[in-house]
């Protein structure tokens, strides 16, 4: 592990978006980024799918074997307000990160350029505004599969910072043991766990991750009210029976020993600040280092496939291998042996 800068000041943005309104939510997020930066935050972390929102409780009219035309209209609103990467939308976030002079991790619903699929995505920007990482959620959970596709590339990016490597897994990805180990293999010292999940067991999970990885775990959750849903929805019955506060926060920072550095904050919007003592990370690994001295790679091995099979096939098909037969002198062959191997007569 490289030498780590002693302290990292972080900010957790526990809040709700302007639901289903991309532009207004980006404007809100930019203000929150700049506020946190003005208060000294060097790393600013948002929840899962903050832009344009997490569609809590919605099915968009899908049932097995049937689709509702009005639910399709609501889905189209969600589609239209999702974020293309890169785009002017990400440029606005990048500018805010640069103005704050901070690393920014933010959850979005991404609209793919290559098709009409939506993804639950986490972006990390650098303090200069550069987009450093994009992670698409590997497997949407339950009914999330009605609106998000499986992540298909760049699944485990980490960002090298003065405080070590930062990486993110989204919500229930953190229940996937091999996904966690993939981040440990990449040397994460600050493990981001953005989500929209407030069940009681979740805090057991993030504490376990901190102990297992001997890293800081940053859990940041949304806080929003049922009244925040748009009033012009075509299927309002889908959210009318939700709890008054479907998602009520509970964001917290866990230290490398599994203890709360900041206790969970419930039922309110709040920017939560914490100063991470980064020297505790290597110190905590004295007796347990998950991918170091407490591992047995000769017995147990993790293989991470980070290649997109579709893109690999396209690249294979388009590559000019120079295997065409030619008449006369073959200009593409520099040595006679190559010509002979390619059945050329030049």
Question: What is the meaning of each model-derived region?
Answer:
Residues 16, 50, 109-110, 175, ...:
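Catalytic metal-binding/acid-base residues of hydrolase active sites
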Residues 22, 34-127, 197-199, 203-213:
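Cys-nucleophile CN-hydrolase/nitrilase-fold catalytic domain and related Cys-dependent amidase chemistry
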Residues 52, 59, 123, 135-139, ...:
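Short beta->alpha transition motifs characteristic of CBS
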Residues 105, 167, 216-218:
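Structural detector of well-ordered beta-strand residues that form the stable sheet scaffold
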Residues 106-107, 121-124, 157, 219, ...:
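Short beta-strand scaffold segments in enzyme catalytic cores
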Residues 222-346:
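C-terminal beta-strand edge segments of enzyme domains
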């Amino acid at each position: 592990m490289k030498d780590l800068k002693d302290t990292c000041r972080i900010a957790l943005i526990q809040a709700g978006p302007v639901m289903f309104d991309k532009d207004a939510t980006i404007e809100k997020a930019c203000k929150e980024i700049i506020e946190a930066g003005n208060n000294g935050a060097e790393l600013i972390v948002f929840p899962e799918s903050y832009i344009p929102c997490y569609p809590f409780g919605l099915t968009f009219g899908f049932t097995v074997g049937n689709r509702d035309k009005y639910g399709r209209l609501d889905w189209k609103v969600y589609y239209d307000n999702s974020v293309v990467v890169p785009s002017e939308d990400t440029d606005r976030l990048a500018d805010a990160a640069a103005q704050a002079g901070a690393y920014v991790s933010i959850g979005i619903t991404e609209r793919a350029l290559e098709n009409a699929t939506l993804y639950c995505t986490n972006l990390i920007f650098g303090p200069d505004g550069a987009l450093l990482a994009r992670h698409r959620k590997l497997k949407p959970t339950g009914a999330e599969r009605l609106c998000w596709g499986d992540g298909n590339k760049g699944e485990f990016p980490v960002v090298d910072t003065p405080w070590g490597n930062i990486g993110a897994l989204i919500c229930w990805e953190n229940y996937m043991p091999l996904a966690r180990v993939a981040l440990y293999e990449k040397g994460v010292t600050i493990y981001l766990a953005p989500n929209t999940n407030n069940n009681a067991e979740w805090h057991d999970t993030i504490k376990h991750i901190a102990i297992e990885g001997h890293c800081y775990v940053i859990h940041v959750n949304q806080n929003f009210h049922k009244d925040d849903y748009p009033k012009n929805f075509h299927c309002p019955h889908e959210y009318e029976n939700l709890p008054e506060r479907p998602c009520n926060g509970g964001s917290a920072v866990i230290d490398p020993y599994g203890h709360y550095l900041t206790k969970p904050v419930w039922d309110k919007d709040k920017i939560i600040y914490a100063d991470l003592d980064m020297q505790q990370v290597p110190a905590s690994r004295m007796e347990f280092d998950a991918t170091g001295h407490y591992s047995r790679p000769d017995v147990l091995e993790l293989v991470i496939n980070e290649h997109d099979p579709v893109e690999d096939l396209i690249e294979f098909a388009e590559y000019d291998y120079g295997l065409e037969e030619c008449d006369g002198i073959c200009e593409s062959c520099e040595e006679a042996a190559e010509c002979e191997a390619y059945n050329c007569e030049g």
